[in-house]
Amino acid sequence: MNFGSQTPTIVVLKEGTDASQGKGQIISNINACVAVQEALKPTLGPLGSDILIVTSNQKTTISNDGATILKLLDVVHPAAKTLVDISRAQDAEVGDGTTSVTILAGELMKEAKPFLEEGISSHLIMKGYRKAVSLAVEKINELAVDITSEKSSGRELLERCARTAMSSKLIHNNADFFVKMCVDAVLSLDRNDLDDKLIGIKKIPGGAMEESLFINGVAFKKTFSYAGFEQQPKKFNNPKILSLNVELELKAEKDNAEVRVEHVEDYQAIVDAEWQLIFEKLRQVEETGANIVLSKLPIGDLATQFFADRNIFCAGRVSADDMNRVIQAVGGSIQSTTSDIKPEHLGTCALFEEMQIGSERYNLFQGCPQAKTCTLLLRGGAEQVIAEVERSLHDAIMIVKRALQNKLIVAGGGATEMEVSKCLRDYSKTIAGKQQMIINAFAKALEVIPRQLCENAGFDAIEILNKLRLAHSKGEKWYGVVFETENIGDNFAKFVWEPALVKINALNSATEATNLILSVDETITNKGSESANAGMMPPQGAGRGRGMPM
């Protein structure tokens, strides 16, 4: 068919599909991301505020951890979800800097917005940002100080990094207490692996935060026990510990079975055989010489009383996570049978005891020779407080872990961002054209961190930033915001330290997220189906193999 000079309209998308594109779409996405950034801004820094979030199921959370807040905010805008993803990635990779990375990404987008409105191609902005971030990372690596070259002990340096991570958290007033706990926890791990999953955290409501305990070994809540456990000893010195994955319980058969017997004696023989089987298992356990028997599966009332008569402590239904950490701490291995257990299959520790902590009883294994694991028992008034203490300790533990692995640190309090910003401004003066403006915009965006730190603390941000620019232009590379004096100062000398990895990861993630948003200029939203079952109903009469009614 001949359409002449006109091109026919071709409809590809079904009716109701929403498609928007062009410069306006990029700006709309930027506005959505900036809205998320504005929600997080007040939480940044040691004097930042906390946010109270009530979820749809009425669960209350109080936190100033960026990743936690974004996870609970239930962000629905597809572009803004990018910020949630980079915050989670930062949390998983380095543990801290989750708020900073979101604020940086939002600010980079905000700085790109005027260029887009003036008609500059988004690809030019992305090219400028990529160049700027590579220069910024190069500068941070140049600034970073190897903590092993410092005169102080390694432990003292790790404590300083942990203290900086805690400065913006709920526990900053108890930092002296929790800093030691964090460093002890990380140093108890295997130096080659540093697997933070082996640090167990148990939350016990009640008491003060400083009643929290560090156990150089394993502690777990007392499992369900049958009658007879009262007679079992609750404390051992240098016990032998047997870990099982065996059910020590006399119970009915799981499968339907039928046994035909001719005489009562035959029935009695079957019953006796069941008892003999369970007693044989119990005798084999006793012969190993173990003082403590742990099992992932239930230990029944018969076994509990059998062990109590022989001064053996037992605990069944121990979680797999706790059991694995027990093995890591006391040695030995988990046995799937009670026969042929050798002495090397048993573990040991200096002290085992069951003790009351708050309203719960806990089993504690201390002084473990193989200890590559530890447990933190956290106390606190309200559940929300303990949950926030756990999140704060997680951030500090990750920071200590990264500092131990990478050993390169920089100063916090906005000092690093100001120095990198000054370096980028100097570089931008050496080039011409649009790239100069874009790199300058990147440098300006970095100043959002010290500016927001000042605003959250109630300081005059304009005055402090002017002082910082002047100090950095004179070569004071570690000058940042000092909260005690409401002024500026050398944050490196004041031990406000952060691993360089936190800054590098935050800059890379924020720039990648910004470039991703800038590269998307079209959004297609498919119309939702009328109902969840639309198109799923069978035609009339087509069910159950019947034909159509006549």
Swiss-Prot record:
Its main location: cytoplasm. Residues 529-550 are annotated as: Disordered. Keywords: ATP-binding, Chaperone, Cytoplasm, Nucleotide-binding. It is found in: Cytoplasm. It comes from the Eukaryota. One of its GO terms (cellular component) is cytoplasm. InterPro entries: Chap_CCT_eta, Chaperone_TCP-1, Chaperonin_TCP-1_CS, Cpn60/GroEL/TCP-1, GroEL-like_apical_dom_sf, GROEL-like_equatorial_sf, TCP-1-like_intermed_sf, TCP-1_chaperonin. Pfam families: Cpn60_TCP1. Molecular chaperone; assists the folding of proteins upon ATP hydrolysis. Known to play a role, in vitro, in the folding of actin and tubulin. In yeast may play a role in mitotic spindle formation. Belongs to the TCP-1 chaperonin family. Heterooligomeric complex of about 850 to 900 kDa that forms two stacked rings, 12 to 16 nm in diameter. This is T-complex protein 1 subunit eta. It comes from Saccharomyces cerevisiae (strain ATCC 204508 / S288c).
